[in-house]
Every structure is written in structure tokens, then in C-alpha cells.
Amino acid sequence: MKKHFVVGETIKRFLRIGTSLALSISTLSLLPSAPRLSSAAGTIKIMPLGDSITYGMADEGGYRKYLSYFLQQKGYTNVDLVGPEGKDSASFNYNGQSVKYDDNHAGYSGYTITNLPGGWFGQLNGILETMQGGDYIKKYSPDIILLQIGTNDVSNGHLDGSEERLHKLLDYLRENMPSNGKVFLTTIPDLGNSGWGGNSNGDIAKYNELIKKVANDYSSKNVIYADIHSVIDASKDLADGVHPNAGGYEKMGKYWLEQIEGYLKASDGPQQTQPTQPSQGDSGPELIYGDLDGDKTITSFDAVIMRKGLINDFKDNNVKKAADIDQNGKAEVADLVQLQSFIIGKIKEFTVAEKTVTEKPVFEKSYNFPAVNQLKSSKDIPDPFIFMDGSKVESTDDWWKRQSEISCMYEYYMYGKWIDGSDDETTYSISGNSMTINVKRKSTGKTASFKAVINLPKNVRHEGGAPVILGMHKGISESTATSNGYAVITYDSDGMFSAPGTAQDNNQHKGAFYDLYPYGRNWDEQTGDLMAWSWGISRILDALYNGAAKELNINPDSSIVTGVSRYGKAASVCGAFDTRIKMCAPSCSGAGGLALYRYSSVGKTYDFSSKGGSSSYTYKENEPLGSLQASGEQGWFNGRFMEFRNAEQFPMDQHMLGALCCDPDRYLFIIGSCESEDWVNAPSVWMAYLGMKHVWDYVGISDHLAINIHKSGHAVIAEDIEKMVQYFDYHVYGIQPKMNLEELQTSVFALPKNKDSFADTFASKWLY
């Protein structure tokens, strides 16, 4: 098939867009800000502020959902929960009924009172600096702040100095909130036997005495003492030794209602304002075919450039792309004929070859690669269209062959051998919301098992059963998914610091996977944890295909894999290697996931105000190769990975891992977080996305790739799930989305004020 486009109109349209864009950029700083909208008089704004307990770790929505619901039941219709996180409306199941609640908050997992040294990434992020960075107290102007903070200070050995840090935080809050506003400062609960940081309850008792003292010192400044410690029984009310379970959060919701109700009855609630947010820009100008000299007109000069390029080969890849007039992937004589015919007026439009997407062929695996010490270092981002032997991809079939080679490269150099399940016999058993996966290795007779947790939607609205999100851990906004008709099955492990049963999170290589496939001396016996965790997700999928899907009314053909942090890396790997998975959706995956090793954002400053964040945020430290090769993380990879002296030795970079998901029948949905996520390097994830896009464009399935960079939160947040399911519903089921899906083709890093010129240059030497 052939299709036509009118060249003149294309150029005119481009010029209109370019002029408009230039005008909007040049005048943006001169335009007055939009007037802020006032909420109804009498509205009382409440900001839940704190760490992961405020966030709701272990039971999405935490105490906030209960407080919101109890306020509704008491008839308080003039209360608005506020904060930069969450959304205006969410729902949960309470006493057999679906209950709506206000999900806005300012809770951040792992945060301390102020920035402190320590933690997994070398720095513990502070609530004070986060509020200052986004100017959130002035933006949301809360009448009441429910402040619970300090668990991470104590558990990380920072009890000393906590009183002074509390003073700094309270001074900032009181200076920036309404003068008659109240801060309810609460104690923190004890830790259970499995709590992080060991037995810290002695220090917690000391810290809680400080809370009482500080609240008393600030009593004249509208700071009120609260005592959550008295509400939570660590032996009964904790889900994981740190975070409350549903019953514990319910107790907290009731307690907070009791504490604030007197103020609610006495207050008329001052009139407040909400901030406005500018819209994001696009990701750059479009290519004009035939305009080889870049002057936005097509003349005989372009024909001269094309003739020289066809004779001597094109030196500039962007010129070569503009010369591919029929868009068949090659600049050739047929393109020159069309160009000359257009210039002399013989034709008024170019004829473009319709791209057809063919089914992927299967290639035999080959691991005949050079040793690490034979690889040449290069600062350039590797061209995905060049084979290891230097030959070029010249057709779609060539690409599928190259994709197979890249897959083998990742096994050989980074993650270890992919175990495809052909030697596994998988059975399952279901009890309530728990599923046990039993695996027998056929060749040895060895057996192993691990557990998963099932979350089912109340109503299945998709034909063929509910789509299923397969999570590397709990805490992936399950209730948002189920409210959209999606099932969620996760490993029975809490959050990003609790390892699944398939492999321990260390370099010991123990767990269900290694019981069946012991770590050995040969490279093909050295499968790392990321592959092992991925193997477990694949066995869950086996169980679904083997009968569990029918029992649960789930459609296993509509599966999505996700996870955060190290499990974001694992989700990237799982989606790359198990082609049965319909969509891969890794979050905050960083180096070793979907962030380029070769791109650093250290020292770069960005404006995140369009996301409700800081207008001047500077990245301080990215996750380096050395960290991944350290003792605590080297178990994620294979032995050969430890041989690399620097990232410039890699014959691939992580845009090529993402490119393993390029498939006519599959999708990649990348999730990132831009603020307070220096370590996982969201700007580099954006660069990797731009690199991947060359592959999807070449194959002709550009809309099978998407990205969502949320403001903050080292997590799969509700926003991500909402956008993910709309994207999936549209592409897989044809359900029209409420959002504009074009938003998922850009990010805050594409805005003119944030754009790095590297985005336009790093792929300029690539074939396509």
C-alpha cells in the first residue's frame, strides 16, 4: 500500500507550529500568572504530613481513608484533605461497601524530619526540605496539619539532634500556614519484632518524650500534642513490624477524628486558594522530509545535497532521515526521483510506503561474544541498529535478529541466563487471597514453592476476564487498580525492601529459584536475583494459564508486570524476557533498569513547577556502576557484570534493554519520579525513552511505547495506575480514555527550560 501527503501543507503547518511555539516560549515569562481560584468559604483544609505511615504503606490510603470517611459520616462536608500527593477521590472497601475518600496528602516513605546522611542511597530525605522545595505549605495553606514524623530518624540512629530538627520544621510550618492554623504533633508507634532498624523501641520512648516536650514548648504557637503511640499495639496492629495493618490504620483514623473534631466545630474555616499549574510543552519539532538543508523549504539545493549523499554516503544522520522521502527506512535513488519531481512541479505530494508490521521471527540464541577485557570503551550511546560484528540493520527482519542478539548480550554480560520455564512444572493452590506456587524442575525432580497475594476487582468489566497486574511486591496502588476492574497479584512481600520468596535480596543466591537452579561456576549457571525474581513472576503467569485464571476470572493474556526501585529493574528484565507479558511497566528503575549508564544528571537544575514541585531542583547524586557492583547489590547481576571497570565498556546501554519489549503485540509503559529521586536519575530514564523511540518508530509501532514521570514518590502511585489502565484499556480493549494519551509521549524534561541538548544529539550518528 502507498499513502500520500502534501508537502507544501506539511511545511506550512510546521511553520505555523514553530512560530506559535516560539511566541509562546518567548512571551511566557512576560505573561501574568492566572488568578487563583478560591474554594467555598468555610472550607477547612487538613494536610496529613509525615513518612510512610502517613503515605499508607502496607494498606493503601492508610489512616487517611478512614479519617476522610469518618468525617463524611459525621457530616463534615466542608473539610478538604490537601497535599501534593494522591488525588481528589479514591475508594476502598469498608465493611463490604465501596467507600470514597479524599486521597490528597503529603506522606513520603522513608523520610526524616530534615535531610540526614544514611539510608539505602546515602541520604535520608527530609520533610522540611521537601515542603520548602515545593513551597507546599503556602500553596495548600492548610488550617490543620497532622504531623507524624521521626520513625526513620530513630531507626537510622539519628535520635540525637531530633529536638532541634523538630524546632526547624515547626518554625517553618507555623511561619507559612495561616496564623490561626493548628499543627497536631504526634508521637510515633513502637516497632514490632520484624521492624526495620532492630530493637529501637527504647529510643522511640525517648523520642516520644521529646515530642511531648516540643509540643509543650510550642503550645502558644498553636502546636497541639497528640499521642498515636497510645493507640497502636505493636503486637497486634502492625502489618510488617513497622507499618500499621488495616485495623491499626482504622484506629488511627478514629483517633485523629477525636483530636480535631473540637477545632472543626469551633472553626468557620478561612477562605483558601489553590495553585495553578502550567501545561507541559512538546518534545521538539517534527522532521520535514525533503528538507535536507533544514531551512524549512524544499528547493534544488536539497536535491544537490541528496545526490552527494547518495554518492558519498550521508555524513549527518538527520539529513539522511530527511532524504528517506518514502519512509521505507532507506535513502535511495527512488527518493531523489520523487524530490526532483516535486521541485519541478511534476508532483504535488510525496508517496510514502505504508509500513507493515510483520510477526516476529524466532532466532536461535548465540552467546559468542568477546570477553569483557576485549571490549572497547566508548562514551557514545550505543546504536541499537548496529550488530556486534559491525553489520547494519537494513530491514524489520534484521531488527528482530538484532533484538535477539541484544537479549543474549544482556544474559551474557549483565543479568545471567534467562530460565524460560521449559524445565519447570508449575502447580498452584489458592486459599482466600493467598496463592501458593509450586514448581518442580523436571530434569532433577527438585521442588520449591513461594507465595503470592491476590487482589480481585469487585466488578469485572473487561471481556474475557479481568486484566492482571503482576507486582514484584505489595504497595503498588492495588485499590486504584481493582477499582478500575484490574486484578492484582503480587509476591507476598511488602514494599521495595522485602525480598520475594524466589530469591533473597543479597549475594547469597538463596530462595526458591536457587533451590532449583543453584548458582554455579559457569556463566550460564550464574543467574542474578533480577532474573530470579522475574522467573517467579513468570511462574505466577504459568499458574494462571494452568487453571488459576479461570478460577479467579482473570485474563492471563492481558498481563502487566510492575515493580519499584530494584524491583523496577526486575520488572524491566521480566518484561524484556517473558514475551507473554502484554505490558511492562517498571517504576523508578534507575541504573541497571531503564536509566542510561552513560548519562549523568548530577549538577543539572530543573524546573518542576509544572508538576507542582520545585522551580529550581538540582540533582546531586546518581546511582553509579560501583554501587551496583558493591556487596549489597552485586547479587542482582551475574558474575561477568563484576568484570566491567566502567559503564563505558558496556556494548549496550539501557535503551536497548527497553527495546527488547518492542513487539507488535506488546507494550512498554515507563514510570519515573522527577523530584527527590536523584539516585534513580529520572532525566536519564527520559533519555533512554528517547533512544528506545527510534526503535519503535523504525518498526512502525510508535504508540506501543509510553512514559509517565510523576512529581515525587519512589513508588507506583495512584496517578501511574490511572494512566496505565487508560493506556492499556485503549490499546488492548479499544476503550476510549478520559485523558489525552499524547501526554504519555512527553515529560517534564521535554520542556524548553529543562531540555538538555544531549537529547537531540546522542542519536545523531545512529542509522535510524
UniProtKB/Swiss-Prot annotation:
Kindly indicate whether the keyword Hydrolase belongs to this entry.
yes
Record's Pfam families? Dockerin_1 (PF00404), GCE_fung (PF22244), Lipase_GDSL (PF00657)
Locate the region Acetylxylan esterase. Answer: 41-264
* Alphabetical list of InterPro entries matching this protein: AB_hydrolase_fold, Dockerin_1_rpt, Dockerin_dom, Dockerin_dom_sf, Ester_Hydrolysis_Enzymes, GCE-like_dom, GDSL, SGNH_hydro_sf
Principal subcellular localisation of the protein: secreted
Against PROSITE patterns, the record matches this protein to: DOCKERIN
On the tree of life, the source organism's domain of life is Bacteria
One term under GO cellular component? extracellular region
Q: In which compartments does the protein localize? A: Secreted
Arranged from A to Z, the UniProt key words for this protein are: Carbohydrate metabolism, Hydrolase, Multifunctional enzyme, Polysaccharide degradation, Secreted, Serine esterase, Signal, Xylan degradation
GO process annotations (BP): xylan catabolic process
The UniProt annotation puts motif GXSYXG catalytic site motif at: 563-568
* Free-text comment about domains: Contains a dockerin-like region in addition to its catalytic domains, suggesting that this enzyme forms part of a cellulosome-like multienzyme complex.
State the similarity comment.
In the N-terminal section; belongs to the carbohydrate esterase 3 (CE3) family. In the C-terminal section; belongs to the carbohydrate esterase 15 (CE15) family.
The name this protein carries in UniProt is Multidomain esterase
Q: What is the lineage of its organism?
A: Bacteria, Bacillati, Bacillota, Clostridia, Eubacteriales
Gene encoding the protein = cesA
